[in-house]
Amino acid sequence: MRSALFFVVVVTLAPASNAEGGDSTHQDKDWPKEWYETPRTASEMGITEYRDSPFLRGRDLPPVKDRLPDDPQVIHPYKEIGKYGGKAKITLGDSWQFFNWESALTISADMQNFLPNLARHWEVSADGRTTTIEIRRGIKWSDGHPLTSDDFIFTFDHIWLDKEYSPVPSRLILGGRAEKIDDLTFRYVFEDPNPQFVNLIAQYGNFMVDPKHYFRNWHPSFVDREELNERIKEKGFISWMAFIDAQRNARIEESAEVPTLRAYKVLSRTPTMMRYERNPYYHKIDPVGNQLPYIDAIDAEVILDNAELVTAKASTGQLDFAAFALRTQDIPILKLGERTGEIDVNVWTRLHTSDVVIQMNFNHPDQKLRELYLDVRFRRALSYAINRPEMNEIIYFGRGTPQQVSVHPTSMYYEEK
């Protein structure tokens, strides 16, 4: 019997910042406690022997020990140690739905703390102007090339701050510079306090590190511009910026050429199918020394703007996993499919305080409407007039939590009053 897993994301009726601290009141009791803590390493757990998937046998690869970092990070499985093998079938509306990302820092499962990932250690100065990061020794890109400080500095200097590629840089990097300390240690330094920068690293850090050894071949800071323009034309792009943007794309145009740090690398891509296979140099292991991931390959069918088709495939067991395209209104259909024993349906509360926000136009051309919208009494009355409990019952089957667009209860900034 084929087993599939589906998550339906249920919303609340009233987005919150990822929290940086707090208690453990929001931890899911079914999840491993290790998901909320700083991950341990192989040496800390006494792991000295490593294994990899038979899928990689017969390939011209170094031994698994030489493909892993010096002291790999240990990831605990959800319920039990997995078995190697298999190909998972999923769907993509775009590949942002397949969060196959790796960044220097990540966020704990309860959204309360920053945790190390590519980084072994990090520190933010007391004045919030300097963030120093030390990455784990021995992490490698999917082509076997070592990850170093140069990769992070390249991205900051030649992607984020390049005036051609990024004419309008993010406000979170303005006034900043990246400095190399050694091959594994670097720092970001800002003219003014920038305490939110570490949050950027944890949330979108996948876009803060690129393989310099690949992209330097396509950047005018490293290649003669005339020669580069000719090569870019041969690739079918109008500029080097367009080419690099396409290569860095994490959606359904994701490139199979670019080395990655992720668990899966793109094997092939067509308009209707993305095929991934395991990264032989992936840097994490499980508690018994198995190199992750467990699943060898993923076939992701590209289905754009057709939630009904995704629901039909999911409810009839044609997929192994589905989540983002499923809607709350699909729960009854999915529950019918669950009765056959072919699929499991899990309802997962999302960390948003609202799907819909009514925002008044305070600059409306009609003066009377503008005055009305600016009147806080009108806005309060409008809020009171929205029957959130009724919406919750009709639209969300009573699974939502009626509330205002405010701070999420998991946030360190949440106050009950």
Located regions from the model:
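Surface-exposed binding/hinge segments that line
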Residues: 170-243
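Extracytoplasmic/periplasmic substrate-binding proteins
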Residues: 105-113, 211-214, 220, 274-279
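N-terminal lobe/hinge region of extracytoplasmic solute-binding protein
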Residues: 48, 54-126, 157, 259-260
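Short Asp/Glu-rich motifs
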Residues: 74-75, 242, 332-333
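Edge beta-strand plus adjacent loop/short-helix module at the start
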Residues: 104, 144, 230-259
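N-terminal short leaders/motifs
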Residues: 72-89, 129-141, 213-227
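Short, low-complexity disordered leader/linker segments with a strong preference
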Residues: 1-78, 177
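Extracytoplasmic/periplasmic ligand-capture domains
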Residues: 18-41, 54, 108-110, 123, ...
